[in-house]
From Swiss-Prot:
Pfam families: I-set, Ig_3, MAM. This is MAM domain-containing glycosylphosphatidylinositol anchor protein 2. It comes from the Eukaryota. Its main location: membrane. Interacts (through the Ig-like domains) with NLGN2. SUPFAM superfamilies: Concanavalin A-like lectins/glucanases, Fibronectin type III, Immunoglobulin. A lipid is attached at residue 924 (GPI-anchor amidated aspartate). Residues 638-738 form the Fibronectin type-III domain. Residues 27-127, 134-232, 242-328, 340-436, 442-533, 540-627 form the Ig-like domain.
Length: 949
């Protein structure tokens, strides 16, 4: 009966027609690595930790199943410090980081979703290992005097190295290894509140032999092949902390454009200190020139000003630091204001009253600032009626005042304030102020036609306030109705002519704007204000902006366009068009949407329908694409072993897909299949006929033949209906000729445990095995010799009993159907490594199971007994006629020293090399090389029943 079922299944596979089943499934995901990690722990921990050396290439692959094909997204968090996804994401199956750095360690998440069920998420923590060069610093202390002549001198040598994992330190004096307790004058300890980051060597009461060369060795125990690093320090009676001197003044005042040189020299320190320059804020200017302790700034500017510090360090004591402040002369922002007599409630200036003219600039350095006053070009000196003062710098820095007491007609004229710096080199700032009978305070008005001001979104608009008076002050614009920024991002904008120009007006800019006078360049009086209303009209915002409607012929469709917002909201009109053809017009009443129905679709009804909703500002448009195009096919990527190993130079591929929303349009009558070799331009096309209706989730299969090994191909699939072509889907198919499994990956290459056995095979590496493992049995490393590499083994310790079995099942491997009139069946070389060491070794068997046969297992290979502490390799030729599965069976021997292991299982097309095959058919060798012979009648039967291609 099993053989009959097997024949039925095989006939189904051989047919080049169409077959189907529901295959839609939510996503599953797992993360595999490239195998370049120096360690991966996943056995006794709740999380997977992938360890890699800094500078190596990280490569993680997210393997997904599910249909339709899930979308993949890689994200990262910083580890335990943060659970928030970072903004950067990778939308790719493989996450590859070349030359990984320490800050890139953390938890990496792979998220897969296809709209079915919940998204599938898996994570792996990446731990980046590194070891920086160690640094030795020296500190010394001198105790109190004893008996007037003796001083105790103690030296501390501190060794620090940044590392992951924690570093282990060791000390040497010359060639002598220093250990705690080995020398009474030496003490080695870790400071409190540290966790291995540093190790201190304390030399108590220095002795002559303590003056020597000391070495600190930092080690992470060769993890990830990171070598130890060493640093040395020569301790002598001349060892001293650094001291320096700056050969410049403090502060240094210079003019813009000048070159300045700062010189720093060492005056002490052993070993010779190194000198570096830093700036109190920010980085050093890019244009500087450094030469040892000399720093030169060519063509200095105000941006280069600040405090510059020279730091000397020789790792003895504390670094020495000297600083100087560079001041670059500058004069800017000259402005004035007129203050009327404060003892009268009148903002005008009048004969017989006091008037004050104030002048202000920003000066660096402020102590060099001087002012000069002129009237009509002639110098002014302070007198009883003309009082010149300078405001307290703490109250109003950089300000001078000219008080005119008892203003007379002869005082009218032009007053000039000139600001200059004593050091020179900077252009003076000159400010003219006219005092006359026409000098009056400002007044603000808004032209009648300028408020409210109506404009359309996207236009350029000018808001205007008319200012009168002499002199005309600066006008400040701001929002009056809400605390929001102005178009330039500031809270206030300045205008010298009273006009505010706004480019590309948006609807958010509607509202009230305030214009007010500033005290600068005008009268120092209560600000004058005026308001301008801005109304921004914008066309209707509608939904949907675009909607695709797929529907078959003779079916009904209703399109609806809805208004979300508009200004003005009334009166709104609408137009429905198909292309340029006007279908319907109308006006909105109380409803917020308009509809257009199509009762029965035909060829002339397909096309783009536009609904325009219109107001004074413009139109909003809903677009509807009504089409009978079929949706794109959905390629099925979860086919196990889709490559068929046909003949020597060609292969076949089982292409599978489902149809997205097959009932949305007319019945699909065929598919147009296009195929081309990767890198080529020409497509080869053929049609695949479809009989009957396709069901949602139905799996369709078509076998691609005569593909050249090992080329990849691009496949394009287009559904066809009576409407015409639908959307196409393209995928790349690749030849994968050899199966290889080293059991490094999380799901052990889809191997599974047999439910009918007594116990299970176990995945293990030497680095992760139980410390209480049984000695004198089992491997000390994987087949490649790596302590971190994984293999599968049977644990024969108690409670296992003699004769109990553990069975490991391979995934199912597909092969190509064969024709009895063509070449003979393809051969496959099946190979693996096995380890059988221990005095109680039992038996290792390998069986072949063909598709459809659940009870018949054909013995391929067998071995028993102790083979020594080494890995052995086995090769077996197999000639399957249908899909097959391999079974590894380990049988427990008479005692606990009977662990059996396997590693590096491979299946390659073609026979094994003759030198790899056993010389005779013994128990320890191949017992099923010709297992295909008894199946020859089946081949004949199948070949008769199946059509030839």
């Amino acid at each position: 009966m099993d053989l009959v079922y097997g024949l039925v299944w095989l006939l189904t596979v051989l047919l080049e027609g169409i077959s189907g089943q529901g295959v839609y499934a939510p996503p599953t995901v797992r993360i595999v690595h490239s195998g370049l990690a120096c360690n991966i722990e996943e056995e006794r921990y709740s999380e997977r930790v992938y360890t890699i050396r800094e500078g190596e290439t990280l490569e993680l692959t997210c393997l997904v199943t599910g249909h339709p094909r899930p979308q993949i997204r890689w994200t990262k968090t910083a580890g335990s410090a943060s659970d928030r996804f970072q903004d950067s994401s990778v939308f790719n199956e493989t996450l590859r980081i070349t030359s990984i750095q320490r800050h890139q360690g953390g938890r990496y998440y792979c998220k897969a979703e296809n709209g079915l069920g919940s998204p599938a998420i898996k994570s792996i923590r990446v731990d980046v290992y590194y070891l920086d060069d160690p640094v030795v610093t020296v500190h010394q202390s001198i105790g109190e005097a004893k008996e007037q002549f003796y001083y105790e001198r103690t030296v501390f040598l501190r060794c620090v190295a940044n590392s992951n994992p924690p570093v282990r330190y060791s000390w040497r004096r010359g060639q002598e290894v220093l250990l705690q307790g080995s020398d009474k004058g030496v003490e080695i300890y870790e400071p409190f509140f540290t966790q291995g980051e540093t190790k201190i060597l304390k030399l108590k009461n220095l002795r002559p032999q303590d003056y020597a060369n000391y070495s600190c060795i930092a080690s992470v125990r060769n993890v990830c092949n990171i070598p130890d690093k060493m640093v040395s320090f020569r301790l002598s009676n001349k060892t001293a902390s650094p001291s320096i001197k700056l050969l410049v003044d403090d502060p240094i005042v210079v003019n813009p454009g000048e070159a300045i040189t700062l010189v720093c020299v060492t005056t002490g320190g052993e070993p010779m200190p190194s000198l570096t320059w830093v700036r109190s804020f920010g980085t050093l200017p890019e244009k500087i020139v450094l030469n040892g302790g000399t720093l030169t700034i060519p063509a200095i500017t105000s941006d280069d000003a600040g405090t510059y510090s020279c730091i000397a360090n020789n790792n003895v004591g504390n670094p020495a630091k000297k600083s100087t402040n560079i001041i670059v002369r500058a004069l800017k922002k000259g402005r004035f204001w007129i203050t009327p007599d404060p003892y009268h409630k009148d903002d005008n200036i009048q004969i017989g009253r006091e008037v004050k003219i104030s002048c202000q600039v920003e000066a660096v350095p402020s102590e060099e600032l001087t002012f000069s006053w002129f009237k009509n070009g002639r110098p002014l000196r302070s007198s009883e009626r003309m009082v010149i003062t300078q405001t307290d710098p703490d109250v109003s820095p950089g300000t001078t005042n000219l008080d005119i007491i008892d203003l007379k007609f002869t005082d009218f004229g032009t007053y000039t304030c000139v600001a200059s710096l004593k050091g020179g080199g900077i252009s003076d700032i000159s400010i003219d102020v006219n005092i006359s009978s026409s000098t009056v305070p400002p007044n603000l008005t808004v032209p009648q036609e300028k408020s409210p001001l109506v404009t359309r979104e996207g236009d350029t608009i000018e808001l205007q306030c008319q200012v009168t008076g002499k002199p005309k002050p600066i006008i400040l614009w701001s929002r009056a109705d809400k605390e929001v920024a102005m178009p330039d991002g500031t809270m206030q904008m300045e205008s010298y002519d009273g006009t505010l120009r706004i480019v590309n007006v948006s609807r958010e800019m509607s509202g009230m704007y305030r214009c007010q006078t500033s005290q600068y360049n005008g009268f120092n009086v209560k600000p004058r204000e005026a308001l301008v209303q801005l109304i921004v009209q914008y066309p209707p915002a509608v939904e949907p902006a675009f909607l695709e409607i797929r529907q078959g012929q003779d079916r009904s469709v209703t399109m609806s366009c809805r208004v979300l917002r508009a200004y003005p909201i009334r009166v709104l009109t609408y137009e429905w068009r198909l292309g340029n053809k006007l279908l319907r017009t109308g006006q909105f009443d109380s409803q917020e949407y308009t509809e257009y129905p199509l009762k029965s679709l035909s060829n002339e009804n397909y096309g783009v329908y536009n609904c325009s909703i219109i107001n004074e500002a413009g139109a909003g448009r809903c677009s509807f694409l009504v089409t009978g195009k079929a949706y794109a096919p959905e390629f099925y990527y979860d086919t196990y072993n889709p490559v068929w190993q046909n003949r020597h130079r060609v292969y076949s591929y089982s292409l599978q897909w489902t149809q997205m929303n097959p009932d949305a349009v007319d019945r699909i009558v065929a598919y147009r299949l296009g195929i081309r070799q990767a890198g080529q331009q020409r497509w080869w096309e053929q049609e695949i006929k479809i009989n009957g209706n396709i069901q949602k989730g139905e799996l369709i299969t078509y076998n691609l033949t005569e593909l050249i090994k090992p080329e990849a191909y691009e496949v394009r699939l287009t559904p066809l209906t009576k409407f015409g072509e639908g959307d196409s889907t393209i995928r790349v198919i690749k030849y994968t000729g050899e199966f290889h499994c080293g059991f490094e990956d999380g799901n052990i290459c889809l191997f599974t445990q047999d439910d009918t056995d007594n116990f299970d095979w176990t995945k293990q590496s030497t680095a992760t095995r139980n410390t209480k493992y049984t000695p004198n049995t089992g491997p000390n490393a994987d087949r490649s010799g790596s302590k971190e590499g994984f293999y599968m083994y049977i644990e024969t310790s108690r409670p296992r009993l003699e004769g109990e079995k553990a069975r490991l099942l391979s995934p199912v491997f597909s092969i190509a159907p064969k024709n009895p009139y063509g070449p003979t069946n393809s051969a496959y070389c099946f190979s693996f490594f096995y380890h059988m060491y221990g005095q109680h070794i039992g038996v290792l068997n390998v069986y072949l199971r063909l598709k459809g046969q659940t009870t018949i297992e054909n013995p391929l290979w067998s071995s028993s007994g102790n083979k020594g502490q080494r890995w052995n390799e086995a090769h077996v030729n197999i000639y399957p006629i249908t899909s097959f599965q391999l079974i590894f069976e380990g049988i427990r021997g008479p005692g606990i020293e009977g662990d059996i292991a396997i590693d590096d299982v491979s299946i390659a097309e073609g026979e094994c090399a003759k030198q790899d095959l056993p010389t005779k058919n013994s128990v320890d060798g191949a017992v099923g090389i010709l297992v295909h012979i008894w199946l020859f009648p089946v081949i004949i039967l199948i070949s008769i029943l199946s059509p030839r291609r």
